[in-house]
Curated annotation (Swiss-Prot):
Pfam family, any one: BacA
Entry protein name: Undecaprenyl-diphosphatase
Membrane topology according to the record: Multi-pass membrane protein
Known role: Catalyzes the dephosphorylation of undecaprenyl diphosphate (UPP). Confers resistance to bacitracin.
Species annotation: Laribacter hongkongensis (strain HLHK9)
Amino acid sequence: MDWLLLAKAAIMGIVEGLTEFFPISSTGHLIVVGDLINFDDRIGNVFEVVIQLGAILAVCWEYRARLWQVAIDLPTSTMARKFVLNLLIAFLPAAIVGVLLIKTIKSYLFNPVAVACALVVGGLVILWAERRECTARVHRIDDMSHLDALKVGLAQIASLIPGTSRSGSTIIGGMLFGLDRRVATEFSFFLAIPIMFAATAYDVLKHWELFTAADLPTFGTGFLFAFLSAFVAVRGLIRFVASHTFNVFAWYRIVFGLIILGSWWLGWINWAS
């Protein structure tokens, strides 16, 4: 058994779990950290699918009571049907654009330099959004209209650019469109479920032949650490947004992005391709 590979898998799982739901871009961090620790490119695409599944199942577990109640009430409750329809409406824009452009995006933007630029720009957008005086008008997820959901879904399109952050685009977009901080954050969590399951299913079908029994320990390690770290991150973020802004994440993005760009410019790394 390759213990070094398992250690790298654990690191990648932790990175995925901690960054998937914080507005700092999980894809961007996986690209950068994967390059730094020289993670096995042979299983890279498949491994990312596995750890994303671990992260999203952590959300399902955290909100299992709410999800179960919605499933039970769906045939009879207008509110439950509205909630599901809002998720579908918010899911579709990024899903459609993603299907059309994913090959182009992966060809040109899946590199650490592009990620660094997106990190910096995204950080500046968060700082700008936090400084705007915007009165929240939606204080419960159940009060969101279909138009609110569509606006969040359109904001999610930006997350197709690696380094932007799916959670960042949906949370900040939701706040700009009138959702309060907690509602925007929780709706982002729920919206992650269909978008990430769809992405996972697509990648599984595309890379099915790369799943081998020999790699199960690596996959299992990454999955476990992604699940546990995502569970901690989701709970922590909900408590955090109750009394804090997202400025700390914005500054982290900016500093991290500038470090990457500076390292590349000085020739310390060769990550442009």
